């Protein structure tokens, strides 16, 4: 099946995109099925897999953790992504928005729940039987739930905020501190810049 294309079961059926089945050393065959979907723009490990396998980096979220609203309509974006899955060089994908219209602008957690519900409604989600006991009556309540809800995943959290850190590709700016520090130190040494109070000159 390697090299074949599979449908992502999200979005309008007539416009669903296809992705290639690839092999890579990253997935753990002892965790779940050993198959994973790669979202290179939003996961450190997926980024490495995408780079090794020439998978375009499609951004799905904005800087506030909501699903993107900008870019091309979903149908156009899905068509471009499917061409890329077939090996075509599609160039810059920054305007490609693979978030279906009904999910655009939603908080990532709300969108995730809707995606799970949509996949479940089509009978495509792997499910398990969840049992709850009513504390007052002792009655047992069984409910079928998507297995994805019960699977533990590694997520980085901010050490101060406790909020989930969502990796995303952004422009990075670097400053050549060697070129900046030298003239600044010279200005302090020759008196053009005065540090007040004086004891902080060494800092």
For each of these PLM feature ranges, what is it?
Residues 13-17:
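Short coil-to-beta-strand transition motifs
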